[in-house]
Amino acid sequence: YSTSFKKDLKVISNNAQKLQKTVEVLGMLQECGVEGIPRKMKPHKLIGQYKGALECHIEPDLLIIWEEYLDEREISLLRLGSHSELFKK
C-alpha cells in the first residue's frame, strides 16, 4: 500500500462503519482481485492520472483505488476517499 493510502485509511478510521466496509472490500480483493468485487460496487478501470488502476465504490462516495498485478497475484492499494478528495482538478 502507498503512503497516501495509509493516510487515507487513517482519516476514515474514526468511522467504524466505513472502516468495516473497507476491510470487507480489502478481503475481497485479497481473495479474488477485481473478480471478487460485486457489480453493484461498480469496479472499473480508470483513465487520467490513475490510468491502469482500478476503482470501486465501497459506499456511494467512498472509493478505493488499486493496481492489480495478475502475474504475481498482488494488489497495490493507492488511494481511499471521496470523489472530490481523489479526483481534484
Kindly label every feature range from the protein language model.
Residues 65-66:
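Acidic, metal-associated active-site segment
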